[in-house]
């Protein structure tokens, strides 16, 4: 929220960006973790899991609608005079849909109660759906950016959250081999160290700017950055985390 109040841009900067700028997403998470357990507890006392689920869904839709409203009313993506969309991107109110979709999923998806022995057709459907969701997530990663207009104006962040929720559900279904595939190396190694990789990648990238900080560019620079990121994340995982 400090970034929002200071009108700091996530997308544009002059000089070296703040070393801890990427921690905004962890701030959104922690704010959610402070508030949502109490909300869920009160809802469970009055209703049940179903009540928690519908409130989470409603709030996810409201967060998405608010992001759309901010994007349209502020003309973030006006082709003649676009405005920086950082307010909608940084805001907990406008970027909480993913957390809320996860909260909704947790109220009804219980893979431990599902059967691993299912008909072949059902196994194919579960596995195929999971693989399709995984491909879709990779497609978002490769071809969609945080400054893509329809992510803001058409509910793209909610769509991505739903696809990820579907992937989680199918990967944890006992009848699907997808979870086993994702649990093999090197994916398990990366997953175990993903928090450290996220924490360290940004400052490392910011102190290795091409030509400005290091005499490298392109693939050699990427190799250096990834090597440093994985190396420091490994030390962090072993001796700190």
Explain the meaning of each model-derived region.
Residues 1-241:
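Membrane-interface helix/loop caps of multi-pass membrane proteins
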């Amino acid at each position: 929220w400090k970034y929002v109040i200071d009108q700091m841009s996530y997308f544009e900067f002059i000089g070296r960006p703040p070393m801890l700028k990427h921690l905004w997403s962890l701030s959104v998470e922690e704010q959610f973790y402070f508030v949502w357990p109490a909300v869920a507890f009160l809802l469970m006392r009055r209703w049940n899991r179903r009540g928690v689920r519908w409130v989470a869904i409603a709030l996810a839709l409201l967060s998405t609608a608010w992001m759309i409203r901010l994007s349209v009313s502020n003309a973030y993506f006006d082709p003649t005079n676009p405005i920086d969309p950082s307010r909608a991107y940084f805001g907990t109110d406008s970027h909480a849909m993913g957390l809320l979709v996860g909260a909704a999923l947790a109220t009804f998806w219980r893979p431990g109660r599902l059967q691993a022995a299912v008909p072949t057709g059902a196994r194919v459907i579960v596995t195929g759906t999971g693989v399709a969701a995984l491909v879709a997530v990779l497609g978002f990663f490769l071809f969609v950016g945080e400054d893509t207009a329809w992510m803001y104006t058409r509910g793209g962040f909610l769509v991505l959250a739903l696809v990820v929720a579907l992937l989680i559900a199918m990967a944890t279904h006992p009848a699907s081999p997808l979870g086993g595939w994702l649990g093999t190396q090197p994916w398990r190694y990366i997953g175990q160290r993903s928090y450290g990789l996220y924490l360290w990648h940004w400052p490392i990238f910011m102190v290795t700017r091409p030509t400005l900080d290091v005499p490298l560019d392109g693939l050699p620079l990427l190799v250096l950055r990834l090597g440093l990121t994985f190396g420091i994340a490994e030390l962090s995982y072993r001796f700190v985390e």
